[in-house]
Amino acid sequence: MATFFGEVQSVFSRAVDEDDEEEEGEEEEEDREIIAELERKREVHVTWNPEVTAAIESSPNRRLPCSNVILSVGDNATGFVSSYILSSGSWEVCGSITLWNERCRDCNPRKDSLPAPSSCTFYRSITDPTVLLCQCNSYIAEDQLFQWCEKVFGSLEKSSLNVTVLSTCPVSEYKTPESTYSLPVPFLKALRTSEYREEVPCPLLEQPNIADGLPAAVLTYCQVWQIPAVFYRCYTDLSKLDSITIDAFRPLLSCQRMSRLAADSAKIQETLRKTVKSSEIQSNLYI
């Protein structure tokens, strides 16, 4: 190319440029392989027991008939379900969810009937097989939330489905013009989809408070699919499992769907005592 006298031109080498392009192409291919491997590793796996699998496969639309799903998220919510509902003994383990992310390494399907401390476990009512409970102590990453909902609810018949979600939240995150120090902690708030018509035993969650994590993902999924769903959030000032926060969920037993699932009071108190004691032992560094 013609140029004027004294102009400095940059040196161009076709060979070097082609080598750089080849290296960049190799790096991009390697990056794509790494991303694909991570995506495979972060897949959410839902495993049902043989009876449920057979029921799904024999169904005309290959979905499990289901009238009620109760999802408990976190230690205190699962503690309530374990003490007040599962302690009746009329439940059986029917499935589990395994996943992998930066805070959860529960990636291997379980072969026994006992839930792992950091797993999602499904229980089915023996007296009414259309009722399912899911206890979730796992951390579900943001990129896994939609997949979680798709995998779980994609296996269930939605025509007569109702969903109830329980979780806790630090009272410091509750947005109110009043001081949180004056609030009667712990306390319940409810958030429901437009299809949910039943009365709730506590005040509704006020704006600008919002749901997040798995409860928000489940509620959003139910809103889109027009599934009646309600989310009960317990605001507490304690981060660990404790009987006071667990008992804060007791008003839910006044709901018709929950009251018929409640265990006997003697079994409730015994299981509650064991649950709290077990948590205290595990949190003691000297034991």
Curated annotation (Swiss-Prot):
Residues 1-32 are annotated as: Disordered. Signal peptide: none annotated. Residues 17-32 have a biased composition (Acidic residues). The keyword Chaperone applies. One of its GO terms (biological process) is proteasome assembly. Its main location: cytoplasm. Keywords: Chaperone, Cytoplasm, Endoplasmic reticulum. Degraded by the proteasome upon completion of 20S proteasome maturation. It comes from the Eukaryota. The keyword Hydrolase does not apply. It is found in: Cytoplasm; Endoplasmic reticulum. Chaperone protein which promotes assembly of the 20S proteasome as part of a heterodimer with psmg2. Forms a heterodimer with psmg2. Belongs to the PSMG1 family. This is Proteasome assembly chaperone 1. It comes from Xenopus tropicalis (Western clawed frog). The gene is psmg1.
